[in-house]
Every structure is written in C-alpha cells, then in structure tokens.
From Swiss-Prot:
GO terms for molecular function: histone methyltransferase activity; zinc ion binding. Zn(2+) 4 binds at residues 638, 694, 696, 701. It comes from Arabidopsis thaliana. It comes from the Eukaryota. Interacts with SUVR1, CHR19, CHR28 and itself. Interacts with CHR27. The gene is SUVR2. Residues 690-706 form the Post-SET domain. Residues 61-136 are annotated as: Disordered. This is Probable inactive histone-lysine N-methyltransferase SUVR2. Probable inactive histone-lysine methyltransferase that acts as regulator of transctiptional gene silencing independently of histone H3K9 methylation. Contributes to transcriptional gene silencing at RNA-directed DNA methylation (RdDM) target loci but also at RdDM-independent target loci. Forms a complex with SUVR1 and associates with the SNF2-related chromatin-remodeling proteins CHR19, CHR27, and CHR28, thereby mediating nucleosome positioning and transcriptional silencing. Residues 458-547 form the Pre-SET domain. In the pre-SET domain, Cys residues bind 3 zinc ions that are arranged in a triangular cluster; some of these Cys residues contribute to the binding of two zinc ions within the cluster. PANTHER family: INACTIVE HISTONE-LYSINE N-METHYLTRANSFERASE SUVR1-RELATED (PTHR46450:SF1). Its main location: nucleus.
Length: 717
C-alpha cells in the first residue's frame, strides 16, 4: 500500500474522533520516526497508538504551560515588598489559589493514567481542552451524559481504554470498531453530567452492566467521544438468540434483531420456527436436500470447526490465515445496504456475514479492510413438480427403488425434466394387461419349490418349462444365453423377422390403403418365477422382480447429449441394471399422443406375427415421458452399446405384455455411461419414434455408414 494512502487513513481515523489535522501531523511524524515507518503498529486497533500519542502530547503541553504560569507567579510574589500589610497578603493568597484552580482546568478532560499503567491509554479525541478565554461547550449542547458511578478494578487495566458495553463470550480485547451500539440494563448506579456546568448528579434506578453481571467504569471523555457532546441514549434491545455453540460452549453463534424505526413490536420466532423456516429456505432457494441435513447441525459444525482452527492454529500457521473468521448477523450493514427493504419485508431473509475476528484487518499490510458484501437471495416460487424435482437431488426415485439414485449436473445449471417416477410400468387406460392366477397352469410354475430355485437340489418346473434358467447363482445372465441375445440384436444374418397379416402400426395410421408389415424382430425371453411359485422373494430366478441393486447416477453429459445414466461402481458382464418402466399404451393411444406432442416409445412387438394380435388392446407399447424410471435417461449408441434389452415374463404367460429389462453386454467400469441401441434405422421410416440426430460417436454408427454409402454411390455415378 502506498504511504500516502496510509497517511490518509490515519487522518480520516483521527477526524472521526474529532481531532484536528493540525494536531495529528506533528505527532504522526514523531511516531513514524519512532516506529521506523512501521504502519502495522501505528494502524493497530484503529490507530490507537496515534490517538494516545496526540492526547499525551496535549496533556504534557497543558502541564508545561501550567507550571510556567506558576513559576512566573512565584517570581512576582518574591518581588513584592515586605511591608505589604496582612490584608494585602491575604488578598494576594486568595488570588493565587484562584489562579491555581484555573490552571488545573487547562488540563484536558481525559481519563487519568493510573500508577504503573503504560503509555497506550486511550483518551477521547472528541472533547477539547477548555481554556479561560471562552467556553468550550456550546450552550445548546446541555443534554446530560449517563455514566457509571463506581471504581474500576486494577486488574482490568488492560481493558480500561476500551468501551465495552456488552459482553459476547468468549471474545476478549474487542476493538473500537466493533463496540455495540446498545447497552443492557444492570444494577449499578448512573451519573448525570450536565454539559453546561460540568455538574455531576446521581440518577437512581438507571444502570449499565455487562452481559455477565459485572460492571466496567467508563470515563466521561470516552463516552463523550462516541456521543460527540450529545445525549448517550441507553437503548434496551431484546436478548440475543443463541443459535449454535460448540460442545463445551467456547464458541457461540448469536442472532439479534433490530426492528425498523417506528415499527410495531415484532413476534420473535422460536428456535423451532426458525429451524423449519431455514430448512425450507435451503430446499427452495439453494436446491439442496439431504435427509441428514440440519441447519442447526450445520451451525454447530461451524462452531466446532472454528474451535479446532483456533486451538490448532499455532501448529498450522503456514497453512491457515492469521485472522480466523467467525459468523455473525450484521443488522446495521443491512440497514445501510440496498437490501434493507428486502430484509425488513420478510424476516426469513436473514443474511449471514463473515467478518474477521481482528476487525477485518488485512494480514499483509495491516490496513483496515472492508466487510464482505451481503447478498440477499430472492425466494423462488416453485411449482409442485419443480419442488418434487428439487427434493429428489439425493434420490431421483424418491425412495421408490431399493437404492438411492442421485442426479448431478457439473456442466451447467440445468435440472432434469419434470416427470413422475414409477418403479414399474402402469396401464394408461385401455391396455389389456390382466394378471390372474387362473391363467397360470400348474406346469408353468413351481408351487412345490421353497427357498432358492437355483439351488442344485431343486428340481424346479420353471427351469424345465423354459429350457433351463437364464441366470447363474451369482445373479448374472448365462454366458451362452447373453451371447445369443447380443447376436440376434446386432448381426442381421442371425435376425429373424416376424410379419403380421395386419400390422397394428399400419392400421393406426388410418390410411386408405393398408401397407404391408415391415417386420418385427423375434427375441429370446426370460421366464422368472412369479406369484404362483412357492420360492422366496430373493430366489435366484427373480432378478428383475428384486429391482435395482447397483449404484447408479443420473448426470448431465458434457458432450451435448443432454442427460444420461452412469454407474458409480464396476459392473460385471450379464448384470441386471434396470427395467424400462413407463405408461402401458395401446397403439391407438400412442398415435393419439404422438399427434399432440413428440414421444419416444418402445413397441412391445417381440411376439407380433407369431401370434394373432386380435384387438387394439393387445398391441402395446411403453412410453416414459411423463411416467417412468431412470431408463428414460439412458442414451442411444449404435451397435456396440454396453446394455441390451431382453423381454422378461414375471406376472403372466400372455406374450403380448412383458417387462423389458436391461443387462450389461460387457464389463463396465465405474463412472462409465450406460447406453443401449434404440434400434432406429435413421431414415424416413422411423415412425412412431421421434426423429433425432445420432451423436453416439460409435465407430459403427449407422448415420456414418449411410453417409459413407452415399458418397460411394456418387463416386460410382
């Protein structure tokens, strides 16, 4: 910092105390020479050393003038004639006494230094030194000053120069800049000083005390410095509310409230009301929700952390700043800021300011710093859906899955689209999905099984009815079964297409001429034990029914593909991830919805063509735009996706409805995005799926192949 700026700050600090620049300049020069221009020592405690030096010099000057005056009078007395009669001598002695009294008045009205006290005593800079030439106090300023009338203990000498009217434990050596504006009521007596004549009178019933019941003496000059020859009013404020503290009470966070001028008596909220309001504020404004989050717990952690830093600060001085911060509410700063109206309009918009324990002094150059800016966050008006979405940060399933599935956005400030989470698919309206025990034959279930059907000792009918189990004892897909499913999905040579006589998709278009069916891919399916089976819920043949058990996370992709799903742990090959859940729509219902807004449905056509799909209520699809689960966030990847969808029968033997479960096609590392092939050909015949531009980045991307084929055709032409 430039020296001229230090000098400017010193003059400004002295002006605030009522000291003229002419008195400051010579003393400041002497201090700079004495401290070898070390501004850090001079600027400490709001230039306290400079103020003391100014008053000491003024006091010495007054004493010196008084002594010189007395010496002159003594010389005059010695030169008087010896023959002066007794009457003249008495008159001369009375005049000498009067002059002594008048000389004593030349000393500045200042707190006298006690024996053994150092030269750093603090005096008032605002009260001048009255002289015999004229009055030093205007007649208009004759309001009384209230002062305590009791002695100061000798052991408090180190605090004698500080005006501390309230005690906030455990702070000591409070600087002048942080002196409270108000004083509490106590039991000590008050003195009234009439400024017009300096007379002191005791007023009964008015007291000044500290927070712990002890009293501190305050000199008239100290009070006069802060009152500037005006009435020092004692304002009674409500007691501070203790918000939090450390375990043993060394560190505390207190909250005080100063109502606006002229306002009615406010209702001071209780701790429970404040806690509920702040937790709701955190949910609405800061978009954080953790079941274990507590505002009071957070503040207690602040106190504990502050205590740890304060007690261990010496050992880690090179790592931590010298001035450790503490948290306090600054009502005065709010009144002076532009946020005053916002604060007074709603009491819940309290603002917490971080300030320094050493009155925000810059650690490097010793300059007095400014307090940090206050920010008032406006309260957001959220809809029910937005509130539900913000509440799902820790678990987007809202507890409907067996594990928590958080969501995170590390790219921008977007949030996931609003939807209703469902763990299993639900019928929208007309879909013929009926689960009944009467439709399950005895040879289609294992009612005689108990425990785990995958145990070697079990002779399960479900295994014989569907050519063995699809799962291993570890809950993974059989290697051979998984490879067959992957080959059917990726290798056109091994794909088998089934054709309908009257395709429900073509019928739903309601065109004059019905176009022929374009074919439906036949898929292998998994048959799990169901309600009529006698095995347990944790049977090895109930993998999909047991739900999600891996750690997954919804995240915003950095490559421009929007939201995606990734795993937080390593997944083996053949592991179940989740099922595709959504609204079960008939094809006519789906086409009606497509006409209103674009959708991305999945057609349940694994058995179309092999069986007669009679009736529109049996041609079904899944649509997860408004009702769905985490599968709606899985992005597309051509051909080499790490997930594959497989039909799973779990409630009924009817082939027109089944679950669509996702399994891993290979080993997947932690934090890797999960993808599956939508099966979209990316041409004009993608109906009813909404068209989109493929951004999978795969080496086998079908869009790249179409572009390369088009280039080859142009070259041949």
């Amino acid at each position: 910092m430039a020296p001229n700026l230090h000098i400017k700050k010193a003059f400004m600090a002295m002006r605030a105390m009522g000291i003229e620049d002419a008195r400051v300049k010579p003393v400041l020069k002497n201090l700079l020479a004495l401290y070898e221009k070390n501004w850090e020592l001079i600027a400490e405690d709001n230039y306290r050393v400079l103020a003391d030096a100014i008053f000491d010099s003024h006091e010495d000057q007054a004493i010196q003038e008084s002594e010189e005056k007395k010496a002159d009078e003594v010389k005059e007395d010695e030169g008087c004639a010896a023959e002066v009669d007794r009457g003249k001598k008495k008159l001369h002695e009375s005049i000498e006494d009067d002059e002594d009294v008048m000389a004593e008045s030349d000393r500045p009205l200042k707190r006298l230094r006690r024996r053994g006290e150092g030269g750093s005593a603090l005096a008032s800079p605002s009260l001048g030194s009255p002289t015999l030439e004229g009055p030093s106090i205007n007649d208009e300023e004759n309001a009384p000053i209230l002062l305590p009338y009791h002695p100061v203990p000798i052991e408090n000498d180190h605090d004698a120069g500080e005006l501390i009217l309230t005690k906030v434990e455990p702070i000591t050596n409070m600087p002048l800049s942080s002196i409270p504006d108000s004083v509490d009521r106590g039991d000590s007596s008050m003195l009234e000083i009439d400024k017009s004549n300096g007379h002191v009178e005791e007023k009964a019933g008015e007291t000044v005390s500290t927070a712990d019941g002890t009293t501190n003496d305050i000199s008239p000059t100290t009070v006069a410095r802060f009152s500037d020859h005006k009435l020092a009013a004692t304002i009674e404020e409500p007691p501070a509310l203790e918000l939090a503290s450390s375990a043993s009470g060394e560190v505390k966070i207190n909250l005080s409230f100063a109502p606006a001028t002229g306002g009615s008596n406010p209702h001071l909220p209780s701790m429970e009301e404040l806690r509920r309001a702040m937790e709701e504020k955190c949910l609405r404004s800061y978009k954080i929700l953790d079941p274990n989050f507590s505002v009071l717990g957070f503040m207690n952690d602040i106190c504990s952390c502050y205590l740890d830093l304060a007690t261990n600060g010496r050992d880690s001085a090179n790592q931590l700043p010298k001035n450790l911060p503490f948290v306090t509410t600054n009502i005065d700063a709010l009144k002076k800021s532009a946020a005053r109206m916002a604060y007074t309009s709603q009491a819940s918009n309290d603002v917490v300011e971080i300030c320094s324990n050493e009155h925000m002094r810059d650690a490097e150059n010793g300059a007095v710093g400014d307090s940090m800016a206050l920010v008032v966050v406006p309260e957001c008006q959220l809809s029910a859906d937005e509130w539900r979405l913000i509440s799902s940060v820790g678990d987007i399933s809202l507890g409907k899955e067996t594990v928590e599935i958080p969501w995170v956005n590390e790219v921008n400030d977007k949030v996931p689209p609003v939807f209703h989470y469902i763990a299993q698919s639900l019928v929208y309206q007309d879909a013929a999905v009926k689960f009944s025990l009467g439709n399950i034959r005895d040879d289609q279930c294992c009612s005689s099984c108990c425990g785990d059907c995958l145990a070697p000792s079990m002779a399960c009918r479900c295994a014989t009815a569907f050519n063995g189990f699809a799962y291993t004892v570890d809950g993974l897909l059989q290697e051979d079964f998984l490879e067959q499913c992957i080959s059917e999905a990726r290798d056109p040579r091994k794909q088998m297409l089934l054709y309908c006589k009257e395709c429900p998709l073509e019928k739903a278009k309601k065109e004059v001429i019905l176009e022929p069916c374009k074919g439906h891919l036949k898929r292998k399916a998994i048959k799990e034990c169901w309600s009529k089976c006698g095995c347990m819920k944790n049977c090895g043949n109930r993998v999909v029914q047991q739900g999600i058990h891996n750690k997954l996370q919804v995240f915003f992709t950095p490559n421009g593909r929007g939201w995606g799903l990734r795993t937080l742990e390593k997944l083996p090959k053949g592991a179940f991830v989740c099922e595709l859940a959504g609204e079960i729509l008939t094809i006519p219902e789906l086409f009606q919805r497509i006409s209103d807004r674009p959708t991305s449905p999945v057609i349940l056509d694994a058995y179309w063509g092999s069986e007669d799909i009679s009736g529109d209520d049996k041609a079904l699809s899944l649509e997860g735009t408004h009702y769905g689960n985490i599968s709606r966030f899985i992005n597309h990847r051509c051909l080499d996706a790490n997930l594959i969808e497989i039909p799973v029968h779990a409630e009924t033997t009817d082939s027109h409805y089944y679950h669509l479960a996702f399994f891993t096609t290979r080993e997947i590392d932690a934090m890797e995005e999960l993808t599956w092939d939508y099966g979209v050909p990316f041409n004009q015949d993608v109906f009813p799926t909404s068209p989109f531009h493929c951004q999978c980045g795969s080496d086998f991307c079908r869009v790249r192949k179409q572009i390369s084929k088009g280039k080859n055709v142009k070259k041949r032409a």
